[in-house]
A protein has these predicted regions:
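Compact, glycine-rich, soluble single-domain proteins
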Residues: 1-122
Length: 122
């Protein structure tokens, strides 16, 4: 898995979020399930081959903590975001998405629909 720093070009973050990029079936299925928590500036990005609603849905089964789910289109524009509660079965974005960022809930004030994000190599 590759690592990236994610920043918001529309509202730059003081500290970019360090993410692990998950594009295999297994890495996306497991996601953050085995973690007891994540720090405020860490998360994962789940990548799909194309934009769609069902393929970019997430489940929260076996999760020990809530997350902020941020759905992005192919141009890294935020198209939806929700606080995903642990143990809720699943969340589906309102519109098709290609990427899902799963980050700490404290990041919610820093992201809005329409924001443009950037993934920078570490």
């Amino acid at each position: 898995m590759a690592n990236y720093l994610v920043n918001n070009l529309s509202r730059p973050l003081k500290i970019p979020i360090r993410i692990k990029y998950c594009d295999s079936f297994f890495s996306k299925l497991i996601g953050l399930m085995g973690h007891s928590e994540i720090s405020e500036n860490e998360g994962i990005a789940l990548a799909q081959k194309t934009e769609d609603r069902i393929g970019s849905s997430i489940h929260m089964l076996f999760m020990r903590f809530d997350i902020l789910a941020i759905w992005l289109n192919s141009h890294f524009i935020v198209v939806d975001l929700k606080i995903a509660k642990r143990w809720n079965p699943f969340y589906i974005p309102c519109v098709p998405a290609r990427y899902v960022l799963e980050v700490h809930t404290s990041q919610k004030p820093h992201f809005f629909i329409g924001d443009k994000l950037i993934f920078e190599d570490i």
